[in-house]
Amino acid sequence: GFDVHIFCPEADAPASRAARKTWVADYLDAGALRDFASSCDVITLEFENIPVEASDVIAACQVPLHPGPKSLAISQDRAEEKAFLNGIGIPTAPYEVIAAASDIQAALERVGGTGILKTRRDGYDGKGQAWVRAPGEAEGAWSAIGEAPAILEAAIPFECEISVIVARSSNGQTLSWAPPRNVHE
């Protein structure tokens, strides 16, 4: 069997019930991260909203960390993620990087006239998103996402959205699970 340790800033994290030990500290507490890493044979991340600096500290401890800091950094920024995917030949919906509300109108024309404004960071399950169907909606959409750096993604026809989870072993073997369908209200 495995002895599972978790590291999180909350003392009452749900995973604590199944863990042998819960390390409670801020994600940027380098000393606590090093102590945690020294107690582990391998470390994995539950989600992508952990500071990259935390993964850098763990990686420096020479404990296998999956995903590593580079993958974590890419997954935290929608523009970086799309550029990476396009760069390795995986197509995405057309998009434009948005730094200010004044960028939206020209970007809207380039993506076909209708799009979804999405924060570059910290967005999930519809959080940090606003539709832009006409140039007059740009300011409202920008305000709705908190005036955060964003991408404007073209509205494209699709049948459904799925999430694909793939695991890869250290020797390169991959395994995937049946993809669940995502339904957003």
Task: Identify what each model region corresponds to.
Residues 74-163, 167-185:
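Active-site nucleotide/adenylate-binding loops and adjacent lid/helix of ATP-dependent enzymes
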Residues 1-83, 102:
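ATP-binding N-terminal substructure of ATP-dependent carboxylate-amine bond-forming enzymes
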